[in-house]
Amino acid sequence: MLLTGSRGAGKTTLIDALTQGCDLPGVRSYARREKPDGPPDCIFLENRRTGERRVIGRFLGGRMEPEAGVLDTFGVQALRDAMEGKNRWAVVDEIGFLENSSPAYCRALEELFRKKRMLAALRKADSPLLCRLRSREDCLVIDLDVLEDRQEHTGAGFPPEKGNL
């Protein structure tokens, strides 16, 4: 299951709700901001199994610059850890543009998709990796922006309010 949507659409919130109480392997990326309303100064990648994390992107010269070497080593190993676990499912939150800087990470990620059932958040953007993942026939893609649009037009909430199932 692939969740996509604009920034703030609820991809991570939904993944957290769906996996609550489950100890699923995989990776999680998140931004660190020095100012709450400012741009991120760096992006971390965390191994969900071990809790280890590394910086995979730094905000330099007005743009986010990938740390491809970290994805090549730490990132690939975190994905391999998820592949080797006993769980049938793995979680990746979120896949964006930084991953494209590391062909080894992209290959390991696609291998994880072949070996495990996946719950993943995809940045709403176009890149070769994101397009390949969204076009997989074995994945259900849910666009949270489309669900939000439907809610506005029909009045149906997502998730449904208690008692409105």
Put a short name on every predicted segment.
Residues 16-63:
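N-terminal phosphate/diphosphate-binding loop that engages ATP/GTP or pyrophosphate donors
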Residues 11:
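Conserved lysine of the Walker
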Residues 20-24, 86-87, 114-117:
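Short glycine/proline-enriched coil/turn segments at helix->beta-strand junctions
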Residues 3:
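Hydrophobic anchor at the beta1->P-loop junction of P-loop NTPases
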Residues 60-110:
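Phosphate-binding/switch loop-helix module in NTP-utilizing enzymes
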Residues 7:
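The conserved Walker
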